[in-house]
A protein has these predicted regions:
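An N-terminal hydrophobic leader/cap segment in hydrolases
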Residues: 4-56, 66
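The serine-hydrolase catalytic nucleophile loop
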Residues: 85-98, 111
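Alpha/beta-hydrolase active-site loop
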Residues: 91, 122-143
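Hydrolase active-site cap/lid region
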Residues: 162-216
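Short beta-strand/loop motif that positions the catalytic acidic residue
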Residues: 229-231, 236-238, 242
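Catalytic active-site module of serine/aspartate enzymes centered on a nucleophile-bearing elbow/loop
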Residues: 278-296
Length: 296
C-alpha cells in the first residue's frame, strides 16, 4: 500500500512538473511563434503584374511582399491585405487578382515572423500596427493621392483595427472574423484545445510570459479599445458559426466602433474560414459594394 502511494505521489509530481513546463515554456512560445508557412505561388502565376516589396520596420526587420498592379488603364485605389496567424501573403493572391481586375491595386505581404518576412515573434498588432504604418509611408511616397484602405481577417483584422486607430492616412477598412481582446481570445483558444478545461489565471500567466519573450505588452492588444478611436468607414463581417472567434466579438466591435459609417454583416452558417463559401455571391457583392464606395 505504501509503495502504491509512493508511485501515485511520484506520478502526480511528474504531472505537476510537466504542467508547469507547459504553462511556463511551451504555451508562451506557441502564442508568439506560429509555424511559418509560404506557398510556391507568384503573382505572375495568376497573370498579375507586380513589383517586389521590401519594407523596413521601426525595429529594423524586413517585411517581404508584392505590390499588385491594376489590370485596368488607371488605378482607382490601393488596399493593404493583412493575413491571419500562421498565414502568408500568397493566401491573398486570388483576392488581389479580383481587386486588380477592378482597377484596384493591393499590397500583399508577410507579417513579421511569418512567411518570408524577418522577425522571430508575432505580437498580434502591438508592433504590427507600426509595421502597417511603415507600409503606408512606402505607399504614400509613390502614390500620395490614391485612396488607401486596409483589409484583414482573423489576427489580420485585429492588426488592421489597431492600425486604423493609429494611422489616419488609411481611409477605410474591411475587417473579417476578428477578436476583441488578446487575453480573452488566448483563453478561448486554450480552453477549446483542452476540450473545455481552462484556467483564466494560467492562460494569463502564459500570455504574460509570451509578452516578456516577445518584448510586448499583451494587455495593450485590445481591438475593442481601438475601435473607439476609429472614424474611418468600416465594413465588419463575421460568421455566426465561427468556431475560433465568437460572433459576439464581431458584434461587440461594431457596437463600440466610433465611426458613423459602419456596416456589420453576419454570414449565416459561416465558420472562421468559410465566409465566402457560405455567403456566396451575395456576400461578395456586399464586400465589393463597400469597396466601390471608397475608391475612385
Amino acid at each position: 500500500m505504501k509503495k502504491k502511494l509512493t508511485y501515485l505521489a511520484l506520478f502526480l509530481l511528474f504531472l505537476l512538473i510537466m504542467g508547469f513546463i507547459g504553462i511556463h515554456q511551451v504555451a508562451p512560445y506557441a502564442i508568439v511563434q506560429p509555424p511559418r508557412v509560404s506557398l510556391p505561388l507568384h503573382p505572375k502565376d495568376l497573370g498579375l503584374k507586380s513589383s517586389p516589396l521590401n519594407v523596413p520596420t521601426k525595429d529594423s526587420l524586413a517585411l517581404a511582399g508584392y505590390w499588385i498592379k491594376s489590370q485596368q488603364d488607371s488605378t482607382r485605389g490601393i488596399i493593404i491585405l493583412v493575413h491571419g496567424i500562421g498565414g502568408c501573403k500568397e493566401h491573398f493572391l486570388e483576392l488581389a487578382q479580383e481587386l486588380s481586375s477592378q482597377g484596384i491595386e493591393s499590397i500583399v505581404f508577410d507579417n513579421r515572423a511569418h512567411g518570408s518576412s524577418e522577425g522571430q515573434f508575432c505580437t498580434y498588432g502591438y508592433k504590427e500596427k507600426e509595421d502597417i504604418q511603415q507600409i503606408v509611408q512606402h505607399i504614400k511616397a509613390q502614390a500620395p493621392d490614391l485612396p488607401l484602405g486596409i483589409w484583414g481577417n482573423s489576427m489580420g483584422g485585429a492588426i488592421a483595427l489597431q492600425a486604423l486607430a493609429l494611422e489616419p492616412r488609411i481611409e477605410f477598412g474591411l475587417i473579417e472574423s476578428t477578436f476583441t481582446d488578446l487575453s480573452q481570445i488566448v483563453f478561448d483558444y486554450k480552453k477549446r484545445l483542452l476540450k473545455g478545461f481552462g484556467s483564466r489565471a494560467l492562460s494569463d500567466y502564459a500570455l504574460a510570459r509570451a509578452g516578456k519573450i516577445a518584448d510586448f505588452e499583451p494587455s495593450q492588444v485590445k481591438p475593442i479599445q481601438a475601435v473607439q478611436q476609429i472614424e474611418q468607414p468600416i465594413f465588419l463581417a463575421h460568421g455566426d458559426a465561427d468556431e475560433n472567434i465568437k460572433v459576439s466579438y464581431g458584434q461587440q466591435l461594431f457596437e463600440h466602433l466610433k465611426s458613423p459609417q459602419k456596416q456589420l454583416v453576419i454570414v449565416e452558417g459561416a465558420g472562421h474560414f468559410s465566409l465566402y463559401e457560405k455567403g456566396g455571391e451575395g456576400y461578395k457583392k456586399q464586400v465589393m459594394a463597400f469597396v466601390e464606395e471608397w475608391v475612385r
